[in-house]
A protein has these predicted regions:
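Conserved catalytic-core segment of nucleotide-activated headgroup transferases in glycan assembly
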Residues: 2-87
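A donor-sugar binding/catalytic signature common to diverse glycosyltransferases
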Residues: 100-148
Length: 194
């Protein structure tokens, strides 16, 4: 059964039954990709693969003394993705690890400073909730100005530094443009019909 909100996952990331209380502070939320997905589906990214991305990102954030939370991808059911996620959890035990079943609303209610995803739909969700979204490379929202998209690894870490320092020029209330983007990407896009 496919979720009517997002046609590639089974469960809604906004399930109100899963509004578990998150006790810890969250400065930055990292949304893991499905590690079996193509890392360069939208063009050549600034990292070679998801492994390089997540490890360099976490190390950089740790050096800035931030409260970091990581949420696994809702489609994390493929064995190789689970194995890699478990290796990350063992390596970064001090971080807050959130289940894929926790509603994104519970996360957004914690008001993190910013959120990071390689190219996930959560980027427009973050912007919708007025939380700074930072991608790690090409993504479906590059034509819009509500997601920060780097062109190089150096620029990626500059964007994160500026987000930490509250120096990114993030204009809030992009709801109309986000609705347009959502329509074009999920409802009007014929790729899913073929």
């Amino acid at each position: 059964k496919i979720n009517p909100e997002l046609n590639y996952i089974k469960k809604s990331p906004y399930n109100k039954k899963n509004l578990f209380k998150i006790d810890k502070k969250i400065d930055v939320i990292i949304f893991l990709p499905d590690f079996s997905d193509a890392p360069h589906i939208y063009g050549k990214g600034v990292f070679n693969d998801f492994s390089e991305w997540i490890q360099e990102t976490v190390e950089f954030l740790k050096s800035n003394n931030l409260s970091i939370a990581i949420k696994e991808h809702p489609n994390n059911w493929i064995y190789s993705s689970k194995v890699f996620k478990n290796k990350l959890k063992n390596k970064y035990k001090a971080l807050t690890w959130l289940s894929k079943d926790i509603s994104n609303l519970a996360i957004f209610n914690k008001k993190p400073i910013f959120g990071i995803s390689p190219h996930g739909t959560v980027l427009h969700e973050l912007a919708y909730h007025n939380i700074i979204p930072v991608a790690s490379g090409p993504n479906p929202y590059m034509s819009y100005n509500f997601v920060f998209t780097p062109k190089s690894k150096k620029e990626y870490f500059v964007l994160i530094t500026k987000a930490i320092q509250n120096k990114l020029n993030f204009k809030k209330n992009h709801k109309e443009k986000i609705a347009e983007c959502y329509y074009m990407y999920f409802l009007h896009n014929g790729d899913y019909i073929k």
